[in-house]
Design a protein with these regions (language model features):
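Short coil-to-helix segment of the ABC ATPase nucleotide-binding domain corresponding to the Q-loop/switch region
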Residues: 104-112
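Conserved ABC ATPase "signature" region
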Residues: 111, 115-140, 192
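Conserved signature/switch motifs of ABC ATPase nucleotide-binding domains
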Residues: 143-146, 164
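Hydrophobic anchor residue at the start of the ABC signature
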Residues: 158
């Protein structure tokens, strides 16, 4: 129902122990709520939020906590109003590293989550066929991951995540290892597919331009221990076109986001696309 939060983090902190036994605080007192939005006709629609910050500021840690792959030291994480205690089908995750099973074909990789969750064979077949078409892998259903480019492997990862139709999609720098043109193509693909789903996306990057182009809101984090220093709304409408990156309003927002990062304590690196 309207007003419900899709994802909530309340006072979340997480520390680790270094190889030398020293405590390392990855994130400290993370707080945000992503509202479950509805269209005027009552349809559930998802938001696109981005976590932006220098390398090592805890962005990936936040995603892993929401995914249920790790647990916070303090604080509470809710997805669809339910406390996160472990992984679940309501959340899907796409990683930067290629994670396809090398012994399975493209179709078998996409089908994997459906199969282990005991979906009927015909439903699995239909979903896989549709997703292969949606992500632009027509003709590659029987190919193995080692024969695919990096961009194509990430298309497989996105399709595999979408197969279970999660309400929340977590993406950990999925395009970081791709060349500039392929990264742009994948951004376009992601926005198109996201626009056809009701999923909320939480996307990690350290590329300022990528964050602005994709997001409805940008959570800017400082260097470790990562803390959200500003929630930056992105005022541009949708659908979006890559040409907007050359406009004055885009450049003005880029400079504002960069100024937020410069004001933050600590050291780290962020990237501005060229």
């Amino acid at each position: 129902m309207p007003g419900k939060f899709k994802v909530s983090l309340h006072n979340v902190s997480r520390s680790f122990v270094s190889p030398t036994g020293e405590p390392i605080q990855a994130i400290h007192d993370i707080n945000f709520d992503i509202e479950d939005l509805f269209s005027p006709d009552g349809r559930d629609i998802g938001e696109f939020r981005v976590l932006l910050g220098p390398s090592g500021c805890g962005k990936s840690t936040i995603l892993r906590l929401i995914a249920g792959l790790d647990h916070p030291d303090t604080g509470e994480i809710l997805v669809n109003g339910v406390p996160v205690t472990g992984p679940g089908r309501d959340r899907g995750m796409v990683f930067q590293k290629y994670t396809s099973f090398p012994w399975l074909t493209v179709a078998q990789n996409i089908e994997y989550g459906l199969k282990i969750n005991h979906f009927p064979v015909e439903e699995r077949r239909q979903r896989v066929a549709r997703l292969i078409e949606d992500v632009g892998l027509t003709g590659f259903a029987s190919s193995y991951p080692e024969t695919l480019s990096g961009g194509m492997q990430q298309r497989v990862a996105i399709a595999r995540t979408l197969a279970l139709r999660p309400s929340v999609i977590l993406m950990d720098e999925p395009f970081g290892a791709l060349d500039a043109q392929t990264r742009t193509d994948m951004q376009e693909l992601l926005l198109r597919i996201w626009g056809e789903t009701a999923s909320t996306v939480l996307f990690v990057t350290h590329d300022v331009d990528e964050a602005i182009y994709l997001a409805d809101h940008i959570y800017v984090l400082c260097a470790r221990p990562g803390t959200i220093i500003e929630d930056v709304p992105v005022p541009f409408g949708r659908p979006r076109d890559p040409s907007m990156k050359q406009t004055e309003p885009f450049h003005e927002l880029q400079q504002h986001v960069l100024s937020c990062l410069r004001r933050a304590p600590g050291q780290g690196q962020v990237r501005v696309s060229v």
